[in-house]
């Protein structure tokens, strides 16, 4: 499984979009992929679950990409999980 970690701020730049697109492209190629949100991206989603970053992240549902975070957020498709365990399961980790 490839783990895409999205931690960049959706307010400052669009690097997070590249992370989401990478996850969607991998899923479209039928490669097992999951997304972990943390850092500035997680802070933004926690403060405003309707922000542009959260809406774009919602595309992961269409490709059945699992989305995780360290803490509970107000998005039904994001699951809170122990991130250390998730990172151990990944064969590759890519950070955006």
What are these regions (language model features)?
Residues 49-76:
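A glycine-rich helix N-cap at a beta->alpha junction
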Residues 77-96:
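C-terminal structural segments of small proteins and small subunits
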Residues 33-39, 66-71:
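Short internal beta-strands
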Residues 15-35:
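Histidine-anchored nucleotide/phosphate-binding helix
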Residues 30, 64, 89-91:
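Short, well-ordered alpha-helix to beta-strand connector turns
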Residues 27-28, 37-38, 42-43, 52:
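RNA substrate-binding interface of SAM-dependent RNA methyltransferases
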